[in-house]
Amino acid sequence: MSQKRNLPSWMSSRDPEITPSKSHCKKPKDEGPTEEHNSRNAPSNKSEHAEPSSNTTEFSKLMEGVVFVLSGFVNPERSTLRSQALTMGATYQPDWNAGSTLLICAFPNTPKFRQVETNGGTIISKEWITECYAQKKLVDIEQYLMHAGKPWRKSSSPQDANREKREHLSKKPEKQVEKKTETRGTPSTSSKNRSACNLVKEPFFVTEVKKWARDDLSQTISWLESQEEKPEPGEIKRIAAEGVLTCLQDAIDSLEQKQDIGSVTELWSFVPRVVKELGKMESSSKKENSTASKEEVCKQAKSWKKIYEAELAKPGEDESTSRVACGYDSDMTVEMTEEEIELAYRNVSLECL
């Protein structure tokens, strides 16, 4: 259950050119020493001995095929991001065009963001570049997606790229290939499985999930305020956020125990949208007789929970602006009588003399 949700290889961070068949080739036992020596030098087996390259060479090729554009950044941050991506083998372009594959964007919903979104391009946050550079490997790109579009790197083979896009999420891709060959004669069944599985594999945009979090918090606060027994005004936001996350965690626990999410929603008077969306994914996979399992829905739920935790931890606009403008916490205000004020004034005057 702790494994990360697998993505099609064009959306994952693994090198698409390296396959299990190339990295686990074995020699027949009956081959002699001479045949082994000749096979090492044969052109057909070069890929076996090409992998163990130096760390420097591998690092400089991590982002080969990535053609990126930067938007919303100023120096020195802009030059740092550009330098890091170039060091890992990516290609820089000053503006988006037909040859671009990836937009690294500082803010959502900017003119450049909408342009690339309309063109079907993939958009990520800067943290993916910095994490790849720091860890010296391609980290999972999913949590950094701001918009999932076309492949974020150019594939060496167009046929491979098309095939990779069609692959379903699965823990064991080998079994999935076998299943495709078995169901080749029944297109209606396979098409149902594909459409339902897409509900799980096609990620909601991160910006959309963040909006869910803000809306869920606002609606939970409104619900709490409408109750006869309501929390203190200074505690209501914290309690609302804890309630949303607790409900989401209950849904995750239910999925881990192979139970329906409906068993959770029945117990809560107010159900956040994120839990409702998970319930829709679960029920759709059942109706379509999909191969999508509770484990896949659970992985999606855990991914969304991380986004919710980060979004709900942010201070609200009213909270942050009031503290900056006023310079004090209103909860710390002390009421004083006229005599206390007069006494305090005299004490301050004496200290100043």
Swiss-Prot record:
Q: Where is this region: Disordered?
A: 1-57, 150-194
Keywords assigned by UniProt, alphabetized: Coiled coil, DNA damage, DNA repair, DNA-binding, Nucleus, Repeat
Effect of a null allele: Reduced capacity to complete DNA demethylation initiated by ROS1.
One GO process term, biological-process aspect: base-excision repair
S-adenosyl-L-methionine listed as a keyword: no
Provide GO CC annotations from the record. nucleus
Point to the regions of Polar residues compositional bias: 1-12, 184-194
Where, if anywhere, are coiled coils annotated? 240-260
Ranges of Basic and acidic residues composition bias in the record = 28-39, 161-183
Pfam families in UniProt: BRCT
All copies of the BRCT domain together span 58-146, 266-347
Q: Localized where?
A: Nucleus
Question: What are the protein's GO molecular function terms?
Answer: damaged DNA binding; double-stranded methylated DNA binding
Signal peptide (UniProt feature, chain positions): none
Describe the function of this protein. Corrects defective DNA strand-break repair and sister chromatid exchange following treatment with ionizing radiation and alkylating agents. Involved in DNA demethylation pathway by stimulating cytosine methylation (5-meC) excision, gap tailoring, and DNA ligation.
Q: How does it assemble?
A: Homodimer. Interacts with polynucleotide kinase (PNK), DNA polymerase-beta (POLB) and DNA ligase III (LIG3). Interacts with ZDP and ROS1. Binds to various forms of double-stranded DNA (e.g. methylated, unmethylated, with single-nucleotide gap flanked by 3'-phosphate or 5'-phosphate ends).
- The name on file for this protein is DNA-repair protein XRCC1
UniProt lists the gene as: XRCC1
